[in-house]
Curated annotation (Swiss-Prot):
Subunit: The cytochrome bc1 complex contains 3 respiratory subunits (MT-CYB, CYC1 and UQCRFS1), 2 core proteins (UQCRC1 and UQCRC2) and probably 6 low-molecular weight proteins.
Underlying gene: MT-CYB
Gene Ontology CC: mitochondrial inner membrane; respiratory chain complex III
Domain of life (superkingdom): Eukaryota
Miscellaneous information on this protein: Heme 1 (or BL or b562) is low-potential and absorbs at about 562 nm, and heme 2 (or BH or b566) is high-potential and absorbs at about 566 nm.
Protein name: Cytochrome b
Membrane topology (UniProt): Multi-pass membrane protein
InterPro entries for the chain: Cyt_b/b6_C, Cyt_b/b6_C_sf, Cyt_b/b6_N, Cytb/b6-like_sf, Cytochrome_b, Cytochrome_b_C_euk/bac, Cytochrome_b_N_euk/bac, Di-haem_cyt_TM
Cofactor names: heme b
MF terms (GO), sorted A to Z: metal ion binding; ubiquinol-cytochrome-c reductase activity
Function noted in UniProt: Component of the ubiquinol-cytochrome c reductase complex (complex III or cytochrome b-c1 complex) that is part of the mitochondrial respiratory chain. The b-c1 complex mediates electron transfer from ubiquinol to cytochrome c. Contributes to the generation of a proton gradient across the mitochondrial membrane that is then used for ATP synthesis.
Residues reported in the UniProt entry to bind a ubiquinone: H202
Location(s) in or outside the cell: Mitochondrion inner membrane
């Protein structure tokens, strides 16, 4: 009776084909859990964000005080805000691992799935930036001023764009209200893109660590892989609650505990840690327009992955040179993030420029050359062995 019910009702049939009877490769590892963990983080962010919005006042005179009110006076408000702060860091941690797994195991060859995922990543970055401005602390205000002012580098219409975003001649009350509206609405657009991402994924099927055709050996998603996801959920929730209770402000900037003051510039303006790699690339180039182009390319380079890596093999599992290049890219990414948190002074300026060059050199030169040459080396070895 249960089997008939979940396959006869149209809604249940859709859920059944996506979560229960979905044919999945039998050898996928826990690295494949980070997609569902990212989805769980998104759900937690939306729920906690809705609760915070009920007590938030989008006014430059009240925003900081309403944030203090949430923490001090609202029942459980401190915990909800801590979950929202820590959840953002955990969300991007899961997303970075998810993207890294996609590069390592060649998931970018599912073009529709990959492109929808990159769009989701860019939307996440924009949403997080908008949310960072809302508490209207000192770092929030100056981050909004610096980042939105980058639009002025757009030829012909830069000044008009900046004033449109600001709602005036400087960052102020209209800016805060616009950012709240966009920060409230964009997560729902992210849900839509996530569903599109899932539809495309289920159309082609998941990849596997071996990089071979998975159709030879598939198992139903439930109960085998669903229990792996549930285990991942339990670990993530445990870590999130522990982090929110013990180290809630580890990733925040101390300057943001002071109200915004347009007359005092912080000695070092920096965004949250998950923006630091792109921020470091932006600062490494003295020219504003060139820096913005490099910033955009640091994210949109993911869209070019299917073109840049043209190997006959899907996964890097059997490509040792590509593995070395991949981990070099990961180390450089971490190094760039560290440099983004440093003051803009020697020797960090030169180090940022070198690390930014390495970042693009890996993607545009090393990945294409090594992927093609490693194929030829393996073919030569197979021919004469």
């Amino acid at each position: 009776m249960t089997k008939i019910f979940r396959k006869s009702n149209p809604l249940n049939k859709m859920i059944n084909s996506s979560l229960i009877d979905l044919p999945s490769p039998s050898n996928i590892s826990y690295l494949w859990n980070f997609g569902s963990l990212t989805g769980l983080c998104l759900a937690l962010q939306i729920i906690s964000g809705l609760l915070l919005t009920m007590h938030f006042s989008p006014s430059i005179n009240l925003a900081f005080d309403s944030t203090v009110h949430i923490v001090r006076d609202v029942y459980g408000g401190w915990f909800i805000r801590n979950v929202h702060i820590s959840g953002a860091s955990l969300f991007f941690t899961c997303m970075f691992i998810h993207i890294g797994r996609g590069i390592y195991y060649g998931s970018f060859k599912n073009l529709k799935t990959w492109y929808s995922g990159v769009i989701l990543f860019i939307l996440s970055m924009l949403t997080a930036f908008l949310g960072y401005v809302l508490p209207w602390g000192q770092m929030s205000f100056w981050a909004a001023t610096v980042i939105t002012n980058l639009l002025s580098a757009v030829p012909m219409m830069g000044g008009t764009l900046v004033e449109t975003v600001w709602g005036g001649y400087s960052v102020g009350d209209p800016t805060l209200k616009r950012f709240l509206v966009l920060h409230f609405l964009m997560p729902f657009s992210m849900i839509a893109v996530s569903l599109i991402h899932l539809v495309f994924l289920h159309e082609t099927g998941s990849n596997n660590p071996m990089g071979i055709n998975p159709n030879m050996d598939k198992i139903p998603f439930h109960p085998y892989l669903s229990f792996k996801d549930i285990l991942g959920f339990s670990f993530l929730l445990t870590f999130l609650i522990t982090f929110s209770l013990l180290l809630p402000y580890l990733t925040t900037d101390p300057d943001n505990f002071s109200p915004a003051n347009s007359m005092v510039t912080p000695p070092h303006i920096k965004p949250e840690w998950y923006f630091l790699f792109a921020y470091s690339i932006l600062r490494a180039i003295p020219n504003k327009l060139a820096g913005i182009i490099a910033l955009v390319m640091s994210l949109s380079v993911l869209l070019l992955m299917p073109i840049l890596i043209r190997s006959n093999k899907r996964s890097m599992t059997f490509m040792p040179l590509m593995q070395v290049t991949f981990w070099l890219m990961v180390c450089n990414f971490i190094f760039l993030s560290w440099l983004g948190a440093m003051p803009l002074e020697p020797p960090f300026i030169l180090m940022s420029q070198i690390s930014s060059f390495i970042y693009f050199f890996i993607f545009f030169v090393m990945f294409p050359l090594i992927s093609r040459n490693e194929d030829k080396i393996l073919e030569f070895h197979a021919m004469y062995s």
